[in-house]
Design a protein with these regions (language model features):
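Low-complexity, flexible helical/coil segments
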Residues: 59, 87-97, 132-141, 153
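Short helix-loop boundary/capping segments
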Residues: 63-117
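Generic preference for hydrophobic/aromatic residues in regular secondary structure cores
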Residues: 1-3, 20, 32-34, 95-99, ...
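Intrinsically disordered, low-complexity segments enriched in small/polar residues
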Residues: 4, 16-18, 35, 68-69, ...
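Short, solvent-exposed loop/turn segments that connect beta-strands within catalytic domains
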Residues: 8-9, 105-110, 153-155
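Beta-strand secondary-structure signal
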Residues: 52-56, 96-100, 142-146
Length: 166
């Protein structure tokens, strides 16, 4: 799901992106180490940190692509056709992304939900079209998302949350 930057988890502003596959999630802190000439031990910390998500959309249309691209592309849709239009936009608006994994445990549905608060796609749409006769004819759309700190949130909880039903 995707929503405008600043959207709370309980908001109804989330847009379903359709079926997809998440390939990876990674929290990437950039560490630093500084040692003064007269100090016995170095001081270590984190200078920057991002979260990265990669995956593939299986179901997508022009409206979904426009929404997740944060203004890089735009879309129109009618009852019979959807159209993506791109080129010339130079501002990408960060979005909030929420990825939900559903699993069945002993007959009970359990969810794991990953939410990043301020993120953008790393590139525009990419599709490798396949033949109808391909063993797997579904043309997926790969994506990569990079989330940055949302400094409007409390320190320590500015990048992402992961909740998992037990």
């Amino acid at each position: 799901e995707v929503a405008p930057y600043g959207t709370t988890a309980a908001s109804s502003a989330w847009t379903n992106l359709g079926a997809g596959i998440v390939n990876s999630f990674k929290h990437v802190p950039t560490k630093y180490s500084v040692q003064a000439g007269n100090a016995p031990d170095p001081i270590e910390g984190v200078s920057t940190e991002v979260a990265q998500i990669t995956g593939e959309l299986i179901e997508y249309d022009a409206t979904v692509l426009s929404t997740i691209n944060g203004g890089l592309i735009s879309a129109t849709a009618t009852s019979s056709v959807s159209t993506v239009v791109a080129g010339g936009n130079n501002i990408i608006t960060p979005m909030a992304f929420r990825i939900t994994n559903k699993r069945i445990v002993s007959g009970t549905t359990k969810y794991t939900t990953l939410t990043v608060f301020k993120a953008t796609l790393d590139g525009g749409p990419e599709i490798t079209f396949k033949s109808d006769n391909d063993a797997d004819p579904i043309a997926v759309m790969p994506f990569a998302i990079t989330a940055k700190l949302d400094t409007s949130l409390t320190a320590g909880s500015q990048l992402y949350t992961i909740t998992r039903d037990l």
